[in-house]
A protein has these predicted regions:
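Conserved class I S-adenosyl-L-methionine
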Residues: 1-35, 43-47, 66-69, 73
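Conserved Class I S-adenosyl-L-methionine
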Residues: 3, 41-43, 158-256
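Class I SAM-dependent methyltransferase SAM/SAH-binding core
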Residues: 33-87
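A short acidic, Gly/Pro-enriched loop at the edge of an enzyme's catalytic core
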Residues: 88-96
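A short SAM/SAH-binding and catalytic strip from SAM-dependent methyltransferases
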Residues: 95-109, 131
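Helix-to-beta-strand junctions that scaffold the AdoMet/dcAdoMet cofactor pocket
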Residues: 105-106, 119-121
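Conserved catalytic/acceptor-binding region of the Class I
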Residues: 109, 116, 124-194
């Protein structure tokens, strides 16, 4: 699946706020090395550079378009194109920062302990994942995909996202490997001045990508029209024409 840094950064302030909240929860320990896995266009990496000015900070992402944008943003930082599930470096890294990325990877029960293994004692694995699959925005993606002439073409699109497990499940996975595990859920309510069409633009940069990428231009246009019609029903505009987009996110800070 390809990614567009330009589309993703259309809502950069809103997408960066959870990264700030995640970073604020990392214990104030001495950090010599930090890596931003799934760094995107470098907005979250920039926060790590600010928080840990004396540390060696790096970023990696599977998208060359995202890495190109990150390198332009932070030319002093090393960025690598790499898939997290094939990332073989052993570290250790004092901080592994995974903001809005692990929901695209399977088998969290194996993945998370493997990431903790790359930490030294006292190091932190910081994770934030959108918990949105049961929100109207994402139910509508699946419904439109199943109902249209593209149903066969999109039969595997929904499966590209991993369902976020419960807090207790993640605690049980991480606690045997960690001295402390903090988990919390926050629902942001983002005001979007563009109304329902703003919701469509938001998810064109993330959740809609597996559904749009297999389609040709005409199919994509028709899909988005059907999706917008559903969004208009699920997220009615307020008096000023804007909408509030509820966006739940699960946070984990696991200290080895």
């Amino acid at each position: 699946m390809s990614w567009s840094a330009r589309q993703y950064t259309a809502f950069e302030d809103e997408r960066t706020r959870p990264a700030r909240d995640l970073l604020a929860a990392i214990p104030s320990a001495q950090v010599h090395s930090a890596i931003d896995i799934g760094c995107g266009p470098g907005n979250s990496t920039e926060l790590l550079v600010e928080r840990f000015p004396h540390a060696t900070v790096r970023g990696l992402d599977s998208s060359s378009d995202m890495i190109e944008a990150a390198r332009k943003r932070l030319p002093q930082v090393r960025f690598d194109v790499s898939n997290i599930d094939q990332w073989s470096e052993t570290g250790p890294f004092d901080v592994i920062f995974a903001n809005a990325v692990l929901q695209w990877l399977p088998d969290h029960a194996s993945l998370l302990p493997a990431l903790v293994d790359k930490l030294p004692p006292g190091g932190s694995l910081a994770i934030q994942m959108p918990d949105t699959l049961n929100q109207p925005s994402h139910r509508l993606m699946r419904e439109v995909a199943a109902a249209g002439p593209w149903a066969n073409k999109l039969s595997g699109a929904a499966g590209q996202r991993t369902e976020v497990a419960s807090a207790s499940d993640y605690y049980s996975v991480l606690r045997p490997h960690c001295s402390r595990v903090d988990i919390w859920l926050t629902t942001y309510h983002h005001p979007l001045a563009a109304g329902p069409s703003g919701i469509v633009e938001w998810f064109k940069g993330s959740g809609l990508r597996p559904f749009l990428e297999p389609l040709n231009e005409r199919e994509r246009e028709t899909f988005l029209q059907a999706y917008l019609a559903g969004v208009e029903q699920a997220y009615p505009a307020l008096e000023d024409g804007s909408v509030l987009l509820p966006f739940p996110r699960l946070f984990i800070v696991a200290t080895r």
